Amino acid sequence: MEFRFNCHPLFRQRIVRINNSLLPTGFVAQHRREALDATAQISEIINFVGQLSAQAQGLSNPVTTSQKLRNSDHHIYLMFESNQKHGLVVGILKVGRKSLYVFDQNGETVNVTAPCVLDFYVHESRQRGGLGRELFDHMLKEENIHPEEMAIDRPSEKLLGFLQKHYGLYKKIPQMNNFVVYEGFFANKHHASDIDGRRMHITASPNTNLFGPTFTTVGEQRRSSSQTRQQVVSPPVVQQPPVGRYAAKRPSCSMAQIIHNSPTTVSTEPNR
């Protein structure tokens, strides 16, 4: 994919990483105008390649745009080929962390903040040449992660075949959302500490038939169990006898005696 401007100054290396600043890694602007021009050019590249990726996947709207990237903590890897003209952008890979509700191997719902593959595209003229593997390997090295530890957002059949061919990923854990998770996902050292505290359970409440199931975390269940144990072992409350004027005997209530048909010692005639 060639552009109307020279891409060589933007790509100081073959694969660059871009965050919400819309400036590639290794790029140093000498003045403000140069930085603004660079962000405008990177935005044009991202929007164009993102549109091509959406068309290749049969999507009506692109997953990757410069505006979405600017308003998120995700980042994009762009692959570049140098030539005698303006250079070529040949691939894009978008990744980022997202909060997901997924099923583990036991079928329990778990809330994790997981690294995800959000978009992946190599131009048709450069496919089957090893560029996709090179781009994906570069991302794994930069993110310090293994492929099975990532959730894949709405992968195409071509991407699923790519992951199986190059990384041996084929054992999927069935999910109810658009993400694909492979065995080994929950061994991820990046979010394993979040899993135990966010493992979800369905309560067996009488209100389930009326309001639907209620999900509680392991932490909430532990606190509830702890409170129950404290209530069981708490000592009985001993009521202290009243003292002073509060210990004086109160007169009987004639109205209560009349209601309950009890004899009363109070005269029915008023004192005159």
Curated annotation (Swiss-Prot):
InterPro entries: Acyl_CoA_acyltransferase, Atat, GNAT_ATAT
Reaction(s) this enzyme catalyzes, per UniProt: L-lysyl-[alpha-tubulin] + acetyl-CoA = N(6)-acetyl-L-lysyl-[alpha-tubulin] + CoA + H(+)
GO biological process per UniProt: neuron development; regulation of microtubule cytoskeleton organization
EC number assigned by the record: 2.3.1.108
Positions that bind acetyl-CoA: 120-133, 156-165
Family matches, as CDD domains: NAT_SF
Keywords per UniProt: Acyltransferase, Transferase
Ranges of compositional bias, category Low complexity: 224-244
Domain of life the protein comes from: Eukaryota
Site (Crucial for catalytic activity): Q57
Domain N-acetyltransferase residues, every copy: 1-186
Primary enzyme class: transferase
Protein name: Alpha-tubulin N-acetyltransferase
Source organism of the structure: Aedes aegypti (Yellowfever mosquito)
